[in-house]
A protein has these predicted regions:
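Hydrophobic small-molecule pocket/channel-lining residues, especially in calycin-type beta-barrels
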Residues: 46, 60, 86, 109, ...
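Double-stranded beta-helix
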Residues: 93-141
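Short acidic-glycine-tyrosine-enriched beta hairpin
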Residues: 66-82
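Short, conserved beta-strand element in jelly-roll/cupin
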Residues: 31-35, 45-63, 101-102
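A short glycine-rich, His/Asp/Glu-containing loop-to-beta-strand
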Residues: 7-43, 49-50
Length: 141
């Protein structure tokens, strides 16, 4: 049976703990799993959403406004709306983080649409991916 809360996008996994419907749009919370040597997503900023990253295991590298932060288990990083950022795992083990975004404008529907656009035969249509990002308030940098 398929886990409705798990969304696979390329090599990364999103497992929703609270989605936009459960919180009436107040927030979303999910586990974000990134395999070694993976970079996701493209540099962007959120027009209307703040993000908090809490390291669960491994080390997530997040570049925020040009400065690299290494987020290990138990460490936290706040990403205010409007700040350009990207996530990657530059290390040899899988990284897992708890992500909370408020308000819950970038939720399950966004990630399901991204999965449909990314998980295709051949190369994804980058312009289509950017259009989905913009629709949900993520602005490619």
């Amino acid at each position: 049976m398929r886990d409705r809360n798990l969304i696979q996008i390329g090599t990364m996994e999103i497992r929703f703990l609270i989605d936009e419907d459960q919180s009436a749009g107040g927030l979303v919370m999910f586990e974000f799993t990134v395999p070694p040597q993976a970079r996701v997503p493209a540099p962007h900023y959120h027009r209307d959403v703040d993000e908090v990253i809490y390291g669960l295991s491994g080390t997530m590298s997040t570049t925020l406004d040009g400065r690299k932060h290494e987020i290990a288990a138990g460490e936290t990083l706040f990403i205010p709306r409007g700040y350009v950022h990207t996530h990657e795992n530059l290390h040899g083990e899988t990284a897992k983080a708890l992500i909370t975004m408020t308000p819950g404008l970038i939720g399950r529907r966004y990630f399901e649409e991204m999965a449909s656009a990314i998980n295709v035969q051949g190369k994804p249509d980058i312009e289509h991916v950017k259009a989905i990002m913009r629709l949900y308030g993520l602005v490619p940098a």
